[in-house]
From Swiss-Prot:
Broad class of where this protein is predominantly found: cytoplasm
Annotated gene: panD
Domain of life: Bacteria
Record note on modification: Is synthesized initially as an inactive proenzyme, which is activated by self-cleavage at a specific serine bond to produce a beta-subunit with a hydroxyl group at its C-terminus and an alpha-subunit with a pyruvoyl group at its N-terminus.
GO molecular function: aspartate 1-decarboxylase activity
Record pathway: Cofactor biosynthesis; (R)-pantothenate biosynthesis; beta-alanine from L-aspartate: step 1/1
EC code: 4.1.1.11
One GO cellular component term: cytosol
Organism, as annotated: Rhodococcus opacus (strain B4)
Record's protein name: Aspartate 1-decarboxylase
Its job: Catalyzes the pyruvoyl-dependent decarboxylation of aspartate to produce beta-alanine.
Length: 148
């Protein structure tokens, strides 16, 4: 059996520009591509945190060290400069690959510089203000105790 698994993600990247009159794709800083193990032409899902839009496209390498996250083509109708996005790549793996594989999870700052690299798809970096599913039982217990 083959399974489609999250291979890598760049979490909470800031869109630096959007160009409607472009052939298509998303331009990603080559440093971020390397950190997330993304190749030029690789399919990615883009999730816009600000408006909920989800779309699929492919990656084009941007200038190394530039922090570029550029939305190109028709996707520019859905995602705007300044929006926070998650770029997710999936891979189709057999049972053995699934057991041995660790995804690449890259958290970035407002300038799209990597600040946290890991392999846990549900990890939230310390001080990020994000809630991880692994925290829900603790949060539920805190809520219940505050109601008493």
């Amino acid at each position: 059996m083959f399974r489609t698994m999250m291979k890598s993600k760049i979490h909470r990247a800031t869109v630096t520009h959007a160009d409607l009159h472009y052939v298509g794709s998303v331009t990603v800083d080559q440093d971020l591509m390397d950190a997330a193990d993304l190749l030029e032409g690789e399919q990615v899902c883009i999730v816009d945190i600000d408006n909920g839009a989800r779309l699929e496209t492919y990656v084009i390498a941007g200038e190394r060290g530039s922090g570029v996250i550029g939305i190109n083509g028709a996707a520019a109708h859905l995602v705007k400069p300044g929006d926070l996005v998650i770029l997710i790549a999936y891979g189709v793996m057999n049972e053995q690959e699934v057991r041995d594989y660790e995804p690449r999870v890259v958290f970035v700052d407002a300038a799209n510089t990597p600040v946290d690299l890991g392999a846990d798809p549900a990890h939230a970096p310390e001080g990020s203000g994000l809630i991880t599913p692994r925290m829900l039982s603790t949060l539920d217990a805190e809520r219940e105790s505050s109601l008493v």
